[in-house]
């Protein structure tokens, strides 16, 4: 079976150099939580990663469409659309796209003193169900802002801003109920058209059926 680490049509990735990562490890703000690698893989057919040697970063994967799976500590987990998981640092693992319905994923490698807090309870697949107040589009925009800020260069202000954004990004998942309730007045649940439009925006990565809408 063909196994690919990268090279997918439409992929986007940024890998920070060791020099930059070492600077982040020592930065008063960024050392608390910072990104080392970030990317987006659409329809990642044959995607397969096996790490027999543990790495010192946490691995965040957010499946927007399709399916996949991962193995860690002898356990295998299936991942569906609108689910994410975080693999802890220091433990060998394997993950891959489904053969018949490969996933579309946003992924981030990260580390820092607060990394264990944000990764807590996310070893199992965590669902982010699209609904009136799910704010999935907002979170995607946060990812894009992080990505483009890094793409604009690695000066200290950029790196510290990315660290601040990433706190917000992971916080929107770790404290998902609070994240949703903070903006629960913006959508009128009784307006069917408004709700349908919002649902389509929250599922921009997927091909929705009329029944789902």
Model regions: which residues?
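A short, N-terminal "cap"/entry segment at the start of jelly-roll beta-barrel domains
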Residues: 1-34, 51, 128, 149, ...
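N-terminal regulatory/effector-sensing and dimerization cores
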Residues: 30-125
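Amphipathic, well-ordered alpha-helical segments in soluble domains
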Residues: 34, 59-62, 138-145, 165, ...
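Short, Lys/Arg-enriched, Trp-marked, Pro/Gly-tolerant hinge/linker segments that flank
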Residues: 125-137, 150-164, 170-212
């Amino acid at each position: 079976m063909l196994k690919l680490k990268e090279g997918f049509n439409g992929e986007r990735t940024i890998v920070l150099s060791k020099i930059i990562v070492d600077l982040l490890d020592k930065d008063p703000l960024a050392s608390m939580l910072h990104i080392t690698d970030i990317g987006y893989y659409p329809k990642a057919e044959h995607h397969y990663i096996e790490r027999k040697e543990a790495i010192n970063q946490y691995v965040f994967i957010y499946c927007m469409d399709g399916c996949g799976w991962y193995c860690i500590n002898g356990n295998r987990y299936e991942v569906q659309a609108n689910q994410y998981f975080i693999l802890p640092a220091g433990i060998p693992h394997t993950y891959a796209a489904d053969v018949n319905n490969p996933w579309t994923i946003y992924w981030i490698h990260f580390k820092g003193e607060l990394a264990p807090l944000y990764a807590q309870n996310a070893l199992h697949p965590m669902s982010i169900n699209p609904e009136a107040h799910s704010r999935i589009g907002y979170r995607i925009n946060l990812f894009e802002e992080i990505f483009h800020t890094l793409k604009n260069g690695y000066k200290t202000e950029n790196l510290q801003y990315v660290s601040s954004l990433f706190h917000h990004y992971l916080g929107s998942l770790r404290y998902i109920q609070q994240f949703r309730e903070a903006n629960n007045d913006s959508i009128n649940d009784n307006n069917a058209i408004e709700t349908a439009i919002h649902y389509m925006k929250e599922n921009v990565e997927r091909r929705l059926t009329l029944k789902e809408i």
